[in-house]
A protein has these predicted regions:
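N-terminal leader/targeting and assembly helices and adjacent pre-domain segments
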Residues: 1-182, 270-274
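Acidic, glycine-rich two-metal-ion catalytic cores of nucleic acid-processing enzymes
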Residues: 182-274
Length: 274
């Protein structure tokens, strides 16, 4: 007997509920995005290091006694900061939408495949709900990408000014700058991974509701080094898709993949036809 399809609402014709395979974020999407971010961050860090070290070499440790030297360092950093803020702005405007569409498109294909495996054929379209999700995801991603150079400059300026104040040598400053580069790269990796998780979770939830699914099973992901105990305890438990699950740790309703660095996903439950 063929599955029932009313508008986009579907039901199992056997009378028994069907649990679909979970939709997971496409790892390739965030890896590709992270590589682009890494390359941009590396160029920014290299430019900043060259400018800072050039001023530092021209004013060795005694520069702490010369007020013009800290001013020259700050001017060099601020000038480069403005330049790289513009470059990250351009990157965000051009690449954020492409990234979100890749993440949500991959999720749609994975969900359609899980439905097809269970015997259902559904073609997803770009309706109002999906369009709003993509718009919101792009806006959040743009804001996060634009924050990268601002946060980097703040941290680098702190490293350099502290170095000037205590008369650190060039080697010490260079070591700290390299460490800050690593911090910024790790933050970019988190942004790529977390935004992929969130976009996948949001579009999947919209599609679940679109096909008439009311419940899903929480699937804890063991990918993180510090799993949330409440998420672990909620593994395989059902929740209402429209309402989300009330996490006792935060006393708020959430969905898989929506909390920062949460890699949990869900199994969609297709109700049985009465």
């Amino acid at each position: 007997m063929a599955p029932t399809l009313v508008s986009n609402a579907i039901a199992s014709p056997t009378g028994k509920a069907v649990t679909l395979d979970p939709v997971r974020p496409n790892l390739g999407v965030d890896i590709a995005y992270q590589k682009k971010l890494d390359a941009l961050i590396a160029r920014m860090a290299a430019a900043m290091n060259r400018a800072i070290l050039a001023v530092y070499r021209a004013n060795p440790p005694e520069l702490a006694q010369d007020e013009s030297s800290p001013a020259a360092l700050r001017a060099a950093m601020n000038s480069l900061g403005r330049e790289w803020a513009k470059r990250f702005d351009d990157f965000a405007e051009h690449d954020a939408k492409r990234f979100v569409r890749s993440a949500t498109g991959s999720a749609d294909r994975a969900f359609a495949a899980s439905l097809k495996k269970a015997g259902f054929t559904v073609e997803f379209k770009m309706g109002k709900a999906a369009s709003e999700i993509i718009t919101a995801a792009v806006a959040e991603n743009v804001a996060l990408i634009k924050s990268i150079p601002e946060q980097y400059l703040t941290q680098v300026e702190g490293v350099v000014m502290r170095g000037v104040a205590v008369g650190r040598d060039l080697g010490s400053v260079a070591t700290e700058l390299q460490a800050q580069f690593g911090v910024t790269k790790r933050r970019a990796a988190l942004i790529a991974r977390d935004q992929n998780n969130k976009a996948t979770a949001a579009i999947t939830r919209a599609r679940q509701l679109e096909v008439g699914s009311a419940e899903a099973e929480w699937v804890h992901s063991a990918g993180g080094r510090k799993p949330r105990p409440t998420h672990v305890a909620n593994n395989n438990k059902k929740y209402k898709i429209a309402e989300g699950w009330l996490d006792p740790a935060t006393d708020k309703r959430i969905w898989p993949g929506t909390e920062i660095n949460c890699r949990c996903v869900s199994r969609t439950i297709i109700k049985g036809l009465k």
